[in-house]
Amino acid sequence: MLEFSVIERGGYIPAVEKNKAFLRADGWNDYSFVTMFYLTVFDEHGEKCDIGNVKIGFVGQKEEVSTYSLIDKKFSQLPEMFFSLGESIDYYVNLSKLSDGFKHNLLKAIQDLVVWPNRLADIENESVLNTSLLRGVTLSEIHGQFARVLNGLPELSDFHFSFNRKSAPGFSDLTIPFEVTVNSMPSTNIHAFIGRNGCGKTTILNGMIGAITNPENNEYFFSENNRLIESRIPKGYFRSLVSVSFSAFDPFTPPKEQPDPAKGTQYFYIGLKNAASNSLKSLGDLRLEFISAFIGCMRVDRKRQLWLEAIKKLSSDENFSNMELISLISKYEELRRNEPQIQVDDDKFTKLFYDNIQKYLLRMSSGHAIVLFTITRLVDVVGEKSLVLFDEPEVHLHPPLLSAFLRTLSDLLDARNGVAIIATHSPVVLQEVPKSCMWKVLRSREAINIIRPDIETFGENLGVLTREVFLLEVTNSGYHHLLSQSVDSELSYETILKNYNGQIGLEGRTVLKAMIMNRDEGKVQ
């Protein structure tokens, strides 16, 4: 029979044991509740396994009573008044490596909510559950991701859903399907709308936000697609909704953030607007938000690793690489060592850390600062089945940095089983996603039509992509318009080239030759 020993922080764990589990008290004050333990087990073969952090609460628990003070120091089965939950998916990944019998006996003994999911209905109003155990974890993860990996199944899953908008004054009916296939090449976890300004891209994204934050809305809603039936997505289908927009001119006011997983889908906003005051955030506000998100990433091993991987990928941009942002981790660890009496979620720690790294933040361009802030916040809040809505990421980013950011975002979504939908007018975004994930948005008065591009978009030439999406606009503007005026003057190819002092690129010369050929054949341009 498996036996448990509960020990103090720093308590002794023997080198050799069998069928034994040790719960080392952490003492971490988790928003006033002290529930954390570190689980180490010796399986039926005597193999030692470090499993990870687990939070244990009990029915009726008050903030002033720690779990450690009440739990028996030796037991083989916790009473039903207790319940437990691993802090992250890594806890269940480590458990999945144990034999089926051993891991399930262990989890049943500590009343784990993944193997006892029916208990959630009985304890859903317990303050310790909602404040401590579900901090950073959602119900969808308990039923989905945690349960899957515990049983050795893949962490990821496909998405099959549609966004629906019913007709309203100024708008027509609209249904947009989305498909995400696990392990597809190229990745299908980033979808995009592209079209000219004013065609309705941002309006569609804002409707999606309303569909999630106001699920009773009958004008905008998401539906789940399968082969048999299409129905509205259930509550909690998306773990969280994250909207990202750094436009100061968008009239849309973001809803108030909803970070409580016990209330269903969480909502997070990344951008310039202050929803509470309907004003723009200051640079100081944005930097403090970054620091809060960075600390959130550092506190969880998996998030820390994802942040580190993201920064390494973004460092393909030379300027980004020269900032040596990975050193922020050592600055964080140094402050923790120097100020052990200050909790990392204390405002005092935030201020001290801000003072320590201010020089890194002040020397960043607006584009690099936005990328760092955005990816850090995304690592902190994106989890299983998160939906990220991004409005015009190209606004502050040059093309190489935009491409690097999109690849980093895709890898993060793959690691966290999420999906992103982007509104853009940049062909660079098209170049990074396949045709099956791209919609051209066309508008004629009230009617909005969406169609797939006629050509494959992933890795295509930017000029080809620009003509594919903006054909009419391209031929009536920019260098096309200037060349057309020269052709209309009945000048020869050589004369026009001379007039421009030979300063016409290869593609422009090809366009010019085609215009002259059509003119000379009597075709109207």
UniProtKB/Swiss-Prot annotation:
What GO annotations for molecular function exist for this entry?
A: ATP binding; ATP hydrolysis activity
What this protein is called in its record is Protein ea59
Which InterPro entries does the entry mention? ATPase_AAA_core (IPR003959), Bact_Antivir_Def_Nuclease (IPR051396), P-loop_NTPase (IPR027417)
Q: Which organism is it from?
A: Escherichia phage lambda
- Disulfide-bonded cysteine pairs: these are none
